[in-house]
Amino acid sequence: MNSKIAYPEIKISGAFRPDKIQEKGKSNRCDTHCSGSSWTSFKSKILKICAPLCCMGSDNDESMAEMPLEPQVEPKSIENNYTLKKKNEEGFLSQQENKSSNQNPSKANNLFDKLGVSKPITFIACILQLGGTSFMESELQTKLSTINSSPFKSLSQYWNAAYNKKESISSSTNSNIKLHLAARKYQTKPEKFNENSSISQVTSAIKATKAFSHLTQPKRALLKESNTGDKDIFKPRYPQLLSCRFTTLSKLAPINNSKSAPKGTHKPNHSENAELKDIKQSSELSDLSLSSQILYPESTTLSEISPIYDSELAIENILESKCFENEQAIIEGVKDFTEFPDLEETQIIYSDLIASSEVSPIYDSELKYESVLESKSSRNEQATIKEKKDNERVLDLSQQCTKFLFSDQKVITPSFCKFAQVSDMCSTEIPWVNFFCDNLDICIEDVQFKSKAFFPPTVTITIFEHEDKNLMNVFDTKNGTSKTLVKPQITNSCLENMLSLVNKNSCIKRLHLKLSKGIMDIKVLTHQLMLYDLYPPAHQTYLWKALERLVNEKVSLGELTPVHKVAAEKRIGDIRMHLIESSDIYVVTENHRWLHIVCEGFNCFLELPEVLHGKKFLKVDEATREDMLMSAETPDDILWITTLISTGSSMSHFPLHAYLEAKERQEFTKKNLLLFCKEDEFLYSDQENEDLLESFERVISEELSLLKSNEPSDISLKKRKRRKNCEKRILGTMMY
């Protein structure tokens, strides 16, 4: 094989820097801390699975994996490492592989020495990162679990945990991972690489990505397997789990954000057993029990170990996780990261980011990152707790916004109604609970309502929808009889007939204009509001203005609360709902699609189009929502706001005239619960009837004459103007 072989560049950095240890002539080998037999057995098994990847196309991979390994020779200096790497690039090691497969095993150098690796454990972490769990074998799994040496105990536990959490991925997927890593740096489409591509092309691309360098600061979150089965290795997840610091596989499991690495306990310049101590510290912090350390879902795979010195990935991690929004200095420092030829330049740039010179620059930078992440994670935890409480306190009327109306006399309901067992409720008090408005932090304290006398009405009205028809059941509590009425439907022909009628008869327009100017009668306004859906938009605007004037008057008299005024000005909900007092609205607990509107002499159950829920209040724009909540005085007002938004078109079937008749204690019309008057039947008929048309026009004329009689005379208007002018002059003199 004559082609040059490009080996992956392995850089070891972070809290354990080999150059600093080697400058003082101290050993940095992990195998010095365990028995020779365990280390030899372990390395032989590791090389058996890693040699095909590391040698990149050797014809004698299996034989090389079984070679007896010589003790690891430590490089004399950093310059020797770079000299060795340059020789590798020039094809120095390729000459060794061009030899026959029968070469003497003793002449083969240790693969770790070939690659300039001084930390086998970190190198294995790199192999696992590239290949995932595909290199896992049952035999190796068994042997790793029996190793009791501390450097490999945590490794075997994590490897076993990863193997148990996720089955081995196929070799083709591993090839795709390598190809994607290569394509990311060169901005090359993955299709240009395939499994038949030359190993040197793929490995040279992988080398350029720096995927193997600087494994001490992983900044990528756990990966989640997509629905299609493909692994998106660049998709971050769970940034809140990234506050831990780890340098080897023993720290790959996420730990609690509230725990940080012990600061100032490790000085690589003065410790010979630095890597072993850090592994022990990490095992104590992470508590490698499978029940506590695996915090990610079952669908997640091994996390991508992102290089700390890769400027693109470092900045991308910061922007994606949004953990450094308030740390502009660190962001600027990371943005200044460029390609570092050696560790000395890295140390110089990192020195601007650290506050202490005793600790390793990279380690101190890690602590600085960790402190930022920890402070951010604490804020995230508080936000999560607050969000959890808000979800518990959401406007769920099934738990928080329900009022019960109890009566000594049982309320008998029809069997076909969708609610049941209302008759079991018997008490005289109305309990309330805390009410919290979602996302607005507004709390209305407990309100204990006093017992109030309740006089059972003569009839119980039930309005519901059945087979696309709006039905009204009227139950007579005295006689025990009931009858079902069908609410007339509004069709396109009905709207066309009303439009032509409005254009022909000017009395309707003059009537609505007088109502909008505040000249009104409660009976006339009630009749027109019940016909609101039939009128064209221009006349509906007149009715809204008339409603605003009436609501303002009732608010000034104390009959309605200020929240009614805000809702009328914003024109929220059904126009008929605005005349219902908030204290008269209740919710049937058995089925939250039913409203119970009751007052003295009136009892009605109204079915809603969907379940009543406080989250519907969030449909209103934020400014309107805040205005309404600020004007709310009692929990009744909050419930009224929610029902106002949730009722929809159901209020068009509500017998508003019967409710106001009971409230005003005066008879509006004859006992017709569906319509205000009998003459309104003409408006819901598709057929033209001259007699009914004349009768309806006569009713409009009578109402118009009634408003004219209520209209103030010119003398009274002049008196009002004089009074206002006097008040203005008095206020002006008082100001001066």
From Swiss-Prot:
GO terms for biological process: meiotic cell cycle. Belongs to the UPF0300 family. InterPro entries: Meiotic_expression. This is Meiotic expression up-regulated protein 27. It comes from Schizosaccharomyces pombe (strain 972 / ATCC 24843). Keywords: Meiosis.
